Amino acid sequence: SEKKIESILQDEKISYKALPENISEAPYISAKAKKYNLSELPNPESVNYKLTTETSIQAILSKPVSFGKNITALKLNEFLEQYVYEGSQFKLWEINEEQRTATFFQIVNNHLLYYNINGYVKVHWNSKNEVFMYEHAMIEKIEPLKQKKIIAPLQIIDELYSKNLLKTGANIVDMKLGYSSLLQMPQAQLFTPTWEVRV
């Protein structure tokens, strides 16, 4: 029961913010990896595109874009809007200062598509904070399928705890519903609703 789970978590000093409510189901989704046609991509005069596979590209900017002193989420989002094909379909996931990269995941059905080689943008910059290249892959022909029952957030936390994936004193800062890959078929991919838990 919820009360029992809550008291176990309290004993273990595992804290969490307000949990998402009213999410009882979400659809499975099928989609296809986009096959690129280089002629449809934006800014051909300032970006040199290269197909790394038929479903992913590398885009090298002829003139690197300076981000000034700091690489910020705001500047990265503006860069995506301005330079990246379908940039508004991607959301920032992480900035890695050490590797000088920022990774964006594709938004599908208003939720993030987690760690999928067919749904991401990776932006690269040099030691002067100038963006010189990005990688791009995306899914298209997105079709919602049958609904899947969603496990309640509190039960997910309990499951993580019982599998020793949550340590005593852990603080859950965020929980969101997204999508992860369930099945890869020759003609399409199948995605399932998945909880993202940030600790």
Q: What residues fall within each predicted segment?
A:
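Short, structured interface segments that constitute the first stable element of a domain
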Residues: 117-149
